[in-house]
C-alpha cells in the first residue's frame, strides 16, 4: 500500500499526538518511517553577522537531529526501518519535497503545534501540505492541551494503542470511481487500527436511495469478505460537506476517509472544496487521498 511513511514533527507535544498512529499503523503496514523536523533561520537579521546566523543554524540543526533521534528511539520495536531528516527551510515545502520523492509515500501529521522560532504553526503547515501534495495524507487533530511528552518513558505497542482516539472510519463516497480510490486506503487503516468501517454515500435526491443502498450494501459485503467489521452504510442528503460533518458529530471519534479532486501545487483546489470544508470544520482526523 505504502512504500514510506513521513512523520513531520516540530518538537511540541501537540505535534507528537500523531505518534500513537505511527506506532500502531506501521505495525500493520510494515513500511519504512522517515521522521522530519524542519527549522528556519531568517536570512537577514539587522545587526547580526553571517557567522552568527550560521552558528544559530548549526545549533538548530543539532537540536533537530537530537530530538529526532529521541523520537526514533521510541520506534525500535515497530519492525521497520526508521530514518531521520533535519533540514533548514520552509516547513511545508520541505515536507512536500520529501513526500514527493516517492508517490506511494503517506504523510502523517498533527494539525496543530506551537509556533515560535524553531517550531511551526502546525495548523498552517498541515493545511499547506494538504493543498499541495499529491501523496496520501493522514491529519490528526489535537484534542487536548499539552501535557507530558509522548517520547518520555517506555511504552509498548499496547500502551501506544491505548492512546488512540479513533474508534471508527467513515468512508465518504459519491459513487464515482475517483471517490472509490480511498476505499483500499480506508481498509488498510481499518485493519491496522482494528476499528470498524462506516461507508456513507452522499445523494442529490431521495429518489436515488434504492440504488444508493444497493451500492452501500455491496460495499459492506466487500468489507466483511475481507474480515473487516462493518455494521452497515448510510445514505446522506443535502450539502455534501455539511452532511459528512453531521455524521462525524453523530459518530464521535471517527476518522474521515475521503478523496479530494483538484490541482496539486500551492494553488487552491478547484474541486476539493468538500474535503477542504470537512477537514477544516469537522474537528475529526482525516485520511485524504488525491484522486487521479
Label each PLM-derived region with a short phrase.
Residues 1, 73-107, 146, 225-256, ...:
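Structural beta-alpha unit
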Residues 1-51, 161-211, 217, 221-234, ...:
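Small/aliphatic-rich secondary-structure junction motif
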Residues 1-17, 80, 106, 127-181, ...:
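Intrinsically disordered or low-complexity boundary/linker segments at protein termini
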Residues 7, 25, 33-35, 67-68, ...:
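Short, structured motif recognition centered on aromatic/hydrophobic residues
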Residues 24-25, 215-216, 224-227, 237, ...:
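C-terminal functional regions that serve as terminal interaction/effector modules
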Residues 53-66:
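A short acidic, glycine-rich active-site loop
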Residues 71, 78, 86-88, 97-110, ...:
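Hydrophobic, ordered structural segments
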Residues 106, 110-132, 146-147, 259-281, ...:
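Glycine-rich, Arg-bearing micro-motifs that act as flexible, cationic patches
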Amino acid at each position: 500500500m505504502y512504500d514510506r511513511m513521513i512523520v513531520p514533527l516540530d518538537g511540541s507535544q501537540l505535534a507528537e499526538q500523531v505518534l500513537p498512529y505511527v506506532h500502531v499503523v506501521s505495525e500493520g503496514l510494515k513500511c519504512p518511517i522517515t521522521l522530519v523536523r524542519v527549522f528556519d533561520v531568517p536570512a537577514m537579521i539587522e545587526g547580526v553577522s553571517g557567522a552568527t546566523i550560521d552558528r544559530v543554524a548549526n545549533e538548530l540543526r543539532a537540536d533537530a537531529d537530537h530530538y529526532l533521534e529521541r523520537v526514533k528511539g521510541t520506534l525500535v520495536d515497530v519492525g521497520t526501518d526508521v530514518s531521520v531528516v533535519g533540514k533548514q527551510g520552509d516547513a511545508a515545502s520541505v515536507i512536500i519535497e520529501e513526500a514527493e520523492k516517492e508517490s506511494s509515500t503517506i504523510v502523517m501529521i498533527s494539525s496543530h503545534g506551537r509556533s515560535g522560532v524553531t517550531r511551526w504553526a502546525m495548523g498552517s503547515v498541515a493545511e499547506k501540505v494538504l493543498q499541495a501534495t499529491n501523496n496520501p495524507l493522514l491529519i490528526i487533530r489535537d484534542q487536548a492541551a499539552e501535557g507530558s511528552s509522548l517520547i518520555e518513558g517506555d511504552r509498548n505497542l499496547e500502551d501506544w494503542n491505548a492512546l488512540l482516539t479513533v474508534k471508527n472510519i467513515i468512508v465518504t463516497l459519491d459513487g464515482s470511481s475517483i471517490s472509490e480510490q480511498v476505499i483500499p486506503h480506508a481498509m488498510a487503516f481499518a485493519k491496522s487500527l482494528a476499528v470498524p468501517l462506516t461507508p456513507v454515500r452522499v445523494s442529490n435526491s431521495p429518489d436515488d436511495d434504492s440504488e444508493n443502498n444497493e451500492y452501500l450494501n455491496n460495499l459492506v459485503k466487500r468489507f466483511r469478505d475481507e474480515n473487516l467489521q462493518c455494521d452497515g452504510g448510510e445514505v446522506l442528503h443535502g450539502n455534501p460537506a455539511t452532511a459528512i460533518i453531521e455524521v462525524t458529530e453523530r459518530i464521535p471519534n471517527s476518522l474521515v476517509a475521503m478523496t479530494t479532486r483538484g490541482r496539486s501545487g500551492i494553488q487552491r483546489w478547484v474541486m476539493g472544496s468538500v474535503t477542504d470544508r470537512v477537514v477544516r470544520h469537522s474537528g475529526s482526523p482525516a485520511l485524504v487521498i488525491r484522486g487521479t
